[in-house]
Amino acid sequence: MPAEPAAGARRRISWALFLAALVSYSWFINGVGGPNPLSRIALTLSLLEDRSVTVDRWVELFPASFADKSRVGDHYYSDKAPGVSLLALPAVWLGDMLWRNVAAPRLGAKACDLGPPTAKGCEPSRVFVLTWIAGLATSALATALGVVLLFHLALRLTGDAAGAAFAAIALGFATPAFGWATAFFGHATAAALLLTGLAVIVLQARPDKTALGAGWAGLAAGLALGGAVAVEYPALPAALVVGALALWRLRGMPAPAAAMAVAGAVLGGLA
């Protein structure tokens, strides 16, 4: 097995992979104004501005493109899993503050002409800019971190830095992950969380793990896998498969450490 590179070299490779991926993803704007991202950003904005989960005013603002919705009584709701909308809250709050106080005043009238032909106006333009920011803070960031995580996972398993870097680059730039990383959908974030859960299990489920360390590792894996399902409900089967792998890998661990790992995973998954 080839010798692993020194810690400094690993950090440099990690930063190079992360920055290359994040800058590449941020250069593109994919799906903004479409039904899927619109449904997600509407929930984020409703939580921030209205302290509500209803999306009525956004349905009224985008009647032609707001297709991903459910109606209960007199109100409309996003029909998407809420996870990615919740994760985007801090970035959208900050982005909206900068948009209102910095970007929009400098752009002047141009700030109201950024939306598609079907939804021109200041408010649609603001929504489209915030959708792009939300995508950067979730899909793009999660995928860039996933690229780095895969590099470290492959490096630990093989000891081959070149092979690990190739695998990470292939994931980030030569698979559909690139496309999903440029859109405010749930796909990329859910995939990155599944990969995180898998990496924690593979790297941390060791016979020499202390009970406390196993508990923290289980908590991290549970949070990642549960988060993936909260972002995209169809991620549940994949999360269950990864969870089954975790149980299988617990066989070689001492009973107290295995019990703590399971308890942490259950707590994290339910959180």
Model-assigned labels for residue ranges:
Residues 143-157, 193-205, 219-224, 239-247:
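Transmembrane alpha-helical segments
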Residues 1-26, 32, 132-135, 139, ...:
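Start-transfer (signal-anchor) and selected internal transmembrane alpha helices
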Residues 2, 200-211, 237-267:
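Perimembrane helix-loop-helix junctions
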Residues 10-37, 45-49, 170-175, 227-228, ...:
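Transmembrane signal-anchor helices characteristic of membrane glycosylation enzymes that use polyprenol
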Residues 11-16, 102-126, 145-173, 191-192, ...:
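Transmembrane-helix signature of polytopic, membrane-embedded enzymes
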Residues 22, 44, 167-172, 200, ...:
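Membrane-interface alpha helices of multi-pass inner-membrane proteins
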Residues 49-137:
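Interfacial juxtamembrane loops and adjacent helix segments
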